């Protein structure tokens, strides 16, 4: 394995103050109506590691940017990291220190392997040496050189960090201040005035490509989005696709949508196969695997024995509240499972999709999982014993629904998923429509309010994810633009006031369960909207403004 996969000339740290970028739009540095192109699906959904997009992914990108800029300069003898404000307050619980160090070592949150993530702090603790991508080893004490400064809040943003590299005489070689503004987006300070900072945004290898290319259907509000759909005759998903394909070839867009969906499905399956206690000191046990096993066996009760021949439960302690194989509410159990699995993976610091944040990473995969396993529009067969196909004995509930890397005929004989290339392609199309419609809603929230829990509370994280998921599901089930907007509005409206209140600063309690609740809320919001005609009293724009 290449320990430092990021080449020193990778242009991940280039920035141009005159060029609009997603980070500049998200941070409010550039007004949404001044941006020629709405935020892209490449901006809204990004692969990274847990547990926080603003406190883990963003700082890791900052560390990578710093080490890349440092590469052509004289080798440093000392590096210090100062974590200010919210990063200082919850940085230990959110693994901010580990994230910055991973970035400085040359790792990207999208590609770093989990073994490296888990080994870097023990390695530093034993050696007190940080190896830069160039191979230079720099003495670094985690206790002394990574400083948490929660009571100092820098003027530009509550999530700030400063990295300083100096020579053996203490002369500064390079010093940079970064601001993690939410969703993994990062701004860099370009002047030395601490009271009046000037900032620009970091570019990345994917996000921001074409943000300054005029979109064929620009929109900066929900009203403008609906007007653009009316004028063009396009659905919200089709309109977003047209904007995407003005910048990138269709094949590139589709490949990215496939990758995002498959990473979500893989995360669900990883969470359902993992056991143990989540890190951080709260001793929170993983629950997804046990729940997956019960649902896969079609249990009729919480502790029901099964027969080897049929896998069906024989109830010995059945209770009225226990969902059975004939209970239509059983679908909710699967949705809960999907969300719990993803957020347990996130809490463990493993691979997730930022959607739109890591703290809310379980909502959209849970609703997407519901779409592909319980909705007949995607070829699933709801009804008695409805749920993912687990007749091969696996408790990885989405292992047969990946969009890529799975031959169509690889599903078990008799499975409702063994339905040929045409059905597979239809399912893929609906998944793409889901993600594209969710992108539109997420872009509106990001540009007109905030998705950072440190700024607006959990209403901006889980609330936004619920709105995006509701819109995506309504779109995939055939909703009109007005119904899709209504679904997002319902989910967002009934998330207003939700605070960011993690116990001990960990993205575990109440965050993991909260994702499950928000996923079910999103499904209900979509169904309510689809039973209506799209007309409603409070607009999505008003709800977003209220949240801000």
Model-assigned labels for residue ranges:
Residues 2-19, 30-42, 57-60, 65, ...:
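Structured, active/binding-site neighborhoods that engage oxygen-rich ligands
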Residues 251-379, 420-453, 457:
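Accessory "access/gating" subregions that flank catalytic or transport cores
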Residues 8-27, 304-316, 377-425:
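Intrinsically disordered, low-complexity terminal tails and inter-domain linkers enriched
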Residues 45-65, 349-367, 458-467:
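Conserved phosphate/anionic-ligand binding catalytic regions in large, soluble enzymes, centered on
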Residues 83, 471-548:
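Functionally critical mobile loop/hinge segments
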Residues 109-321, 334:
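C-terminal regulatory domains involved in ligand/effector binding and gene-expression control
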Residues 61, 337, 341, 362-372, ...:
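Contiguous, well-ordered alpha-helical segments that form the cores/surfaces of helical PPI scaffolds
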Residues 54-69, 365-377, 424, 471-478:
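Alpha-helical support elements that line or immediately flank enzyme active sites
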């Amino acid at each position: 394995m290449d320990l430092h996969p990021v080449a020193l000339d990778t242009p991940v740290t280039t920035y141009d103050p005159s060029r609009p970028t997603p980070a500049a739009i998200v941070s409010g540095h550039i007004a949404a109506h001044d941006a020629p192109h709405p935020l892209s699906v490449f901006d809204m959904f990004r692969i990274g590691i847990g547990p926080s997009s603003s406190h883990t992914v963003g700082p890791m990108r900052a560390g990578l940017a710093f080490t890349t800029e440092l590469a052509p300069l004289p080798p440093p003898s000392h590096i210090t990291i100062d974590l200010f404000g919210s990063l200082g307050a919850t940085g230990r619980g959110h693994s901010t220190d580990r994230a910055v160090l991973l970035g400085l070592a040359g790792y990207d949150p999208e590609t770093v392997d989990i073994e490296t993530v888990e080994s870097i702090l023990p390695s530093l603790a034993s050696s007190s040496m940080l190896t830069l991508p160039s191979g230079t080893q720099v003495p670094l004490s985690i206790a002394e050189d990574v400083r948490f400064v929660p009571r100092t809040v820098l003027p530009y943003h509550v999530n700030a960090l400063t990295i300083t590299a100096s020579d053996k005489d203490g002369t500064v070689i390079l010093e940079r201040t970064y601001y993690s503004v939410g969703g993994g987006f990062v701004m860099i300070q370009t002047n030395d005035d601490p009271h009046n900072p000037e900032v620009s945004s970091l570019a990345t290898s994917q996000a921001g490509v074409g943000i300054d290319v005029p979109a064929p259907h620009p929109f900066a509000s929900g009203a403008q989005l609906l007007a653009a759909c009316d004028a063009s005759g396009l659905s919200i998903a089709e309109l977003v696709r047209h904007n995407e394909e003005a910048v990138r070839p269709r094949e590139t867009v589709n490949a990215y949508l496939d990758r995002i969906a498959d990473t979500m499905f893989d995360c669900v399956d990883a969470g359902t196969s993992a056991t143990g206690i989540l890190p951080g000191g709260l001793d929170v046990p993983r629950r997804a695997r046990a729940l997956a096993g019960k649902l896969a066996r079609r249990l009729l009760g919480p502790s029901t024995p099964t027969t080897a021949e049929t896998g069906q439960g024989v109830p010995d302690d059945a209770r009225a509240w226990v969902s059975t194989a004939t209970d239509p509410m059983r679908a909710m159990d699967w949705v809960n499972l999907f969300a719990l699995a993803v957020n347990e993976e996130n809490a463990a610091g493993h691979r997730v999709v930022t959607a739109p944040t890591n703290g809310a990473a379980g909502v959209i995969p849970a609703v997407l999982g519901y779409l592909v396993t319980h909705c007949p529009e995607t070829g699933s067969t709801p009804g008695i014993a409805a749920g993912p196909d687990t007749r091969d004995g696996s408790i990885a509930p989405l292992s047969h629904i990946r969009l890529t890397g799975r031959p169509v005929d690889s599903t078990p004989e008799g499975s409702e998923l063994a339905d040929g290339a045409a059905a597979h392609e239809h399912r893929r199309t609906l998944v793409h429509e889901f993600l594209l419609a969710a992108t539109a809603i997420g872009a509106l929230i990001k540009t007109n309010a905030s998705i950072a829990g440190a700024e607006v509370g959990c209403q901006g994280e889980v609330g936004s994810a619920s709105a995006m998921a509701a819109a995506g599901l309504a779109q995939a089930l055939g909703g009109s633009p007005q119904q899709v907007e209504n679904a997002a509005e319902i989910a967002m409206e009934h998330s207003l006031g939700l605070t960011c209140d993690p116990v001990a600063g960990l993205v575990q309690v109440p965050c993991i369960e909260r994702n499950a609740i928000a996923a079910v809320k999103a499904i209900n919001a979509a169904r309510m909207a689809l039973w209506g005609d799209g007309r409603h009293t409070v607009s999505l724009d008003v709800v977003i403004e209220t949240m801000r």
